[in-house]
Amino acid sequence: MTKFFFKRLQTAPLDQEVSSLDASDYYYRIAFFLGWTPPKGALLRWIYSLWTLTTMWLGIVYLPLGLSLTYVKHFDRFTPTEFLTSLQVDINCIGNVIKSCVTYSQMWRFRRMNELISSLDKRCVTTTQRRIFHKMVARVNLIVILFLSTYLGFCFLTLFTSVFAGKAPWQLYNPLVDWRKGHWQLWIASILEYCVVSIGTMQELMSDTYAIVFISLFRCHLAILRDRIANLRQDPKLSEMEHYEQMVACIQDHRTIIQCSQIIRPILSITIFAQFMLVGIDLGLAAISILFFPNTIWTIMANVSFIVAICTESFPCCMLCEHLIEDSVHVSNALFHSNWITADRSYKSAVLYFLHRAQQPIQFTAGSIFPISVQSNIAVAKFAFTIITIVNQMNLGEKFFSDRSNGDINP
């Protein structure tokens, strides 16, 4: 059982068969748990659709609605730290609604990319190429598990820090269980909230990790393609026609990678744009909660884990997009420095065509406005400092406590 769950986290032996689909193994397992990948059987599909409706209703409808209703009905009962902790999640939930709906509705794109890019697996023939491929499969699955641990770690820390403080973690509106009536009610309401928020968090995980999974696949196959290009016309036993066929195969594989990048481009543009809009606001609220209001070591840990989770939502994807541009440049450089000088005319014509195509790097943009890069991620994160400066200059924290002490805000 342990081997079944964790075998993809270790690099497979070079003599073992590995496919591109294996790189998204854990991603699709989480998708199956959330109800996003229905089975093929008709009866099972109907039963499974009920679970899909349940998770979608809890994560996309009830979670943001429950937080908003709590502000309307029980706003006077929030402490500043509780309010900011809940508000962070509420704002993130609004972004999660957009990202999750887009990702769920575009799951067909992932299946299409898997079908296309799987045709490149048979190109991994040398030991070096298989080593690159096997390491990538293990690394991508490990990243998905690390994301899952980080996201659920935030939920876990928030749950226990709040319960030990005698409060419900997010104080979702719950007409069935009032956590203020007793110890057992507190635990029941808190566990229910934890389940709802965990589902919403995993839905956001699906929106945040698909780019890492597939861009890593693109990078891996570009690295293998670069190795194949460097070895073109190095075998004296092959004829010029066979060398030409190898060049044509490289051109076709590069075209397949470009086609996959075009498939993922629309969904990546929307989800990363939505994430960029949320990063600065969420980081600003978390920093305000830590800097301007009383906290225990546990609430600080919960806020820090939230900051880590927010940063991991966009930073790895931005970094991979930059590396993908560099990989495209490396492919064109490898082609230019390959052994084509003494080739025949048809081979040189293919080289010129391929060189023209390879010099156009694979780039992605967020909302068709700004490039997806580390620099863009840092730029939107700087908005957090703007929020902190506004709160500091207007002394909002001191005014809040002053109003409470004067009785203007009744708890």
Swiss-Prot record:
* Localization per record: Cell membrane
One GO BP annotation here? detection of chemical stimulus involved in sensory perception of smell
The transmembrane segments are 47-67, 87-107, 140-160, 186-206, 272-292, 297-317, 370-390
Give the Extracellular compartment stretches of this protein. 68-86, 161-185, 293-296, 391-411
Assembly, in brief, is: Interacts with Orco. Complexes exist early in the endomembrane system in olfactory sensory neurons (OSNs), coupling these complexes to the conserved ciliary trafficking pathway.
Mind listing the UniProt keywords for this protein, alphabetically?
Answer: Cell membrane, Membrane, Olfaction, Receptor, Sensory transduction, Transducer, Transmembrane, Transmembrane helix
Q: What is this protein called?
A: Putative odorant receptor 59c
A single Gene Ontology CC annotation of this entry is: dendrite membrane
Q: What is its main location?
A: membrane
Q: What does this protein do?
A: Odorant receptor which mediates acceptance or avoidance behavior, depending on its substrates. The odorant receptor repertoire encodes a large collection of odor stimuli that vary widely in identity, intensity, and duration. May form a complex with Orco to form odorant-sensing units, providing sensitive and prolonged odorant signaling and calcium permeability.
Describe tissue expression. Expressed in olfactory sensory neurons in the maxillary palp.
Q: Which residues lie on this side of the membrane: Cytoplasmic?
A: 1-46, 108-139, 207-271, 318-369
What Pfam families does UniProt report for this protein, alphabetically? 7tm_6 (PF02949)
PANTHER family to which the protein is assigned, alphabetical:
ODORANT RECEPTOR, ODORANT RECEPTOR 19A-RELATED
**Superkingdom of origin:** Eukaryota
Note the topology in the membrane: Multi-pass membrane protein
Its UniProt miscellaneous note says:
The atypical heteromeric and topological design of the odorant receptors appears to be an insect-specific solution for odor recognition, making the OR/Orco complex an attractive target for the development of highly selective insect repellents to disrupt olfactory-mediated host-seeking behaviors of insect disease vectors. Odor-evoked OR currents are independent of known G-protein-coupled second messenger pathways.
